C-alpha cells in the first residue's frame, strides 16, 4: 500500500544533456515506489502535468521523459511513432535512460511501474516485459503482434473508450491474449467515452482540439475518476 501524499514538487530536469523530463516527488518522507510516465502525442502539456501531479499525489516518484527533446514535436513526432511501430528506436532508449535515473534515486523503493496515455499508452504495453513490476495503458495503441509483444509481461491495467475508433476492440483483444499468456490483467472499456477521456481539459490546442472533439476525443470526468481509482488500486497492489 502506497502512502498518500499531497502537493508533489514538480521539477523540470535534464535526464541527459539531450533529454529533458518532468519529475514529480511527493511531499513527506519516502521512500516511494517509482513510476515512469510516457506522455501523449501532444507532449508534456497542461494535461500531462495534471496527470503526473495526480499520480505523484498518490505516493509515487514519477518521471516523464520528454520524447520531443531533440527538436520539438514537429521534428520528433514522426520518429517517435516509427519507434512505437517498430518496438525499438530512440524513444525506447530515452525511456530506458529515464528509468535508470529514476530507480537509482535514494528516495525510491525497488518497485517500478510504467504508465502511458494515448501514444504513451502504446509504449507502456511494449514496455510491460522490459523489467517493470506493473504497467498501465490508457487508450494506447495495440502492438501488431500481441502474443510476441506481451509474452512475459508484468501485470497490466488498461483503460479504453468504447467510442475510440480503431481501439473499440482493445479490451476483447487484450483480454484474450493476456489470458492465453497467463499475464495478470484488468482491462476496462468505458462505453460512453472516446479517446483521451482522462484529460482534464480538451487537448490539441485551438485547432486540433476542435477536430478531436468532433471525433469524440474529449474529457469525461466521471470515467476519468473511475479510471484513476483503478490505477491507484492497481499500482497500490503491485508496487507496494
Task: Please identify what each model-predicted range represents.
Residues 4-107, 200-217:
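Serine-hydrolase catalytic machinery in alpha/beta-hydrolase-like enzymes
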Residues 162-168, 195-196:
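Acidic catalytic loop of the alpha/beta-hydrolase fold
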Residues 157-160, 190:
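Short beta-strand/loop motif that positions the catalytic acidic residue
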Residues 96-153:
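Primarily recognizes the serine-hydrolase "nucleophile elbow" in alpha/beta-hydrolase
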Residues 143-153, 164, 220, 229, ...:
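Conserved serine/cysteine hydrolase catalytic core
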Residues 51, 168-178:
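Short alpha-helix in the alpha/beta-hydrolase fold that links the catalytic acid
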Residues 60, 67, 140, 190-192:
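Active-site loop/turn elements of alpha/beta-hydrolase fold enzymes
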Residues 184-240:
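C-terminal catalytic histidine-bearing segment of alpha/beta-hydrolase fold enzymes
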Amino acid at each position: 500500500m502506497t502512502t498518500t501524499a499531497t502537493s508533489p514538487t514538480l521539477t523540470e530536469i535534464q535526464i541527459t544533456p539531450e533529454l529533458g523530463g518532468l519529475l514529480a516527488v511527493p511531499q513527506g518522507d519516502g521512500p516511494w515506489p517509482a513510476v515512469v510516465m510516457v506522455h501523449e502525442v501532444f507532449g508534456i502539456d497542461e494535461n500531462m502535468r495534471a496527470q503526473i501531479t495526480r499520480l505523484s499525489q498518490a505516493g509515487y516518484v514519477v518521471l516523464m521523459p520528454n520524447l520531443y527533446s531533440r527538436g520539438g514535436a514537429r521534428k520528433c513526432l514522426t520518429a517517435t511513432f516509427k519507434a512505437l511501430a517498430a518496438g525499438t528506436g530512440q524513444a525506447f532508449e530515452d525511456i530506458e535512460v529515464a528509468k535508470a535515473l529514476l530507480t537509482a534515486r535514494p528516495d525510491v523503493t525497488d518497485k517500478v511501474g510504467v504508465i502511458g496515455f494515448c501514444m504513451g499508452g502504446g509504449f507502456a504495453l511494449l514496455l510491460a516485459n522490459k523489467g517493470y513490476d506493473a504497467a498501465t495503458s490508457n487508450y494506447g495503441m495495440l502492438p501488431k503482434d500481441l502474443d510476441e509483444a506481451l509474452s512475459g509481461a508484468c501485470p497490466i491495467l488498461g483503460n479504453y473508450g468504447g467510442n475510440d475508433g480503431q481501439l473499440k476492440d482493445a479490451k476483447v483483444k487484450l483480454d484474450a491474449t493476456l489470458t492465453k499468456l497467463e499475464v495478470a490483467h484488468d482491462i476496462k472499456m468505458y462505453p460512453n467515452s472516446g479517446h483521451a477521456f482522462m484529460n482534464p481539459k480538451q487537448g490539441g490546442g485551438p485547432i486540433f482540439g476542435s477536430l478531436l472533439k468532433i471525433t469524440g476525443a474529449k474529457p469525461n470526468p466521471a470515467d476519468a475518476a473511475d479510471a484513476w481509482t483503478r490505477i491507484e488500486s492497481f499500482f497500490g497492489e503491485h508496487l507496494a
